[in-house]
Amino acid sequence: MSSPMPQSSLNNSQVANMIDESNETPSTTPPMISNTNTPVPEIEMEEPNAPQDNTVAPNSIDGEKVQEENEDDDEQEEEEEEEEEEEESLSLPLSKIKKIFKMDPDYLAASQSAVYATGLATELFIQYFTEQSLVLAKMDKRKKLQYKDFSNAVASQDSLNFLSDTVPKTQPIGELINSKKVNVNSHDNNEIREIDNTEIDEIEVDEPVNATRKVKPLAKGQQTLNFSATNTATESINPMPIKKSVISDIVTTDNETEVTSKEATEEVEDQDVIMIN
């Protein structure tokens, strides 16, 4: 057996190497456990077969309903504000545009933006149509627009040609007569020229007084009386005045009754009497 080396026999270099090796090797000793008691959280143990309570508190349901109602109210207010802003920007009322939409039998529904776009497009079209007509009026050195300005604008502009049936181009009747495009009698020609000079827009024509009436067929054995139509017409225009009776016309004296009775007997004597057996 080898005897252990004595401590004195170790060199200084060997002692230094042993110290270095002891510093390089990690310590495997476990940490010291403190003697103080640390608090442990209490955990409730649940049984695996225990029924779970999934019921929701009624207060939470009411809160959700109130929140949804508030959101709906906010959306309605925003839509109303948008409608008011759109109506302020348009001169045409949106309600009238919706009524025009509903006149179409194939109409079902339209969004608010579609109604607004239709109103805006209508205003822009009317503005363009008026500007084109105003240019033609200024060419004639006039400040007021006339029908011929709109009709000439439709005839001259390709973009407005679709209105040719709605706004047709017209010509004064006097020019047509002078150019012999329209033939009229001399009497009618004078009347038309007078109308052109006075610039009458509308002429009211009275219906004839003696209108033809359909006569219904009479029954067998009946006959129509031959009254003149002129008398009936004059009577309808100028009826005879009605004479009012007075009390003195109704009340008669005794002398008047005697005279009238004598006259009646004389008239009967003069007449021929036919006797029937």
Curated annotation (Swiss-Prot):
Cite the Gene3D superfamilies for this sequence. Answer: Histone, subunit A
In residue numbers, the region (Disordered) covers 1-91
User: Which Gene Ontology MF annotations are present?
Assistant: protein heterodimerization activity
- Keyword annotations from UniProtKB, A to Z: DNA replication, Nucleus
Q: Where is the composition biased (Polar residues)?
A: 1-16, 24-39
Q: What does this protein do?
A: As accessory component of the DNA polymerase epsilon (DNA polymerase II) participates in chromosomal DNA replication.
| Origin organism lineage | Eukaryota, Fungi, Dikarya, Ascomycota, Saccharomycotina
On the tree of life, the source organism's domain of life is Eukaryota
Query: Known SUPFAM superfamilies for this protein?
Result: Histone-fold
Q: What name does the UniProt record give this protein?
A: DNA polymerase epsilon subunit C
Primary subcellular site in the record, as a coarse category = nucleus
Species this protein is from? Debaryomyces hansenii (strain ATCC 36239 / CBS 767 / BCRC 21394 / JCM 1990 / NBRC 0083 / IGC 2968)
Q: Name one GO biological process term.
A: DNA-templated DNA replication
Q: State the InterPro entries in the record.
A: CBFA_NFYB_domain, Histone-fold, Transcr_DNA_Rep_Reg
Compartments where located? Nucleus
Question: Is Nucleus one of the keywords?
Answer: yes
Assembly and oligomerization: Heterotetramer. Consists of four subunits: POL2, DPB2, DPB3 and DPB4.
Got a GO cellular component term for this one? CHRAC
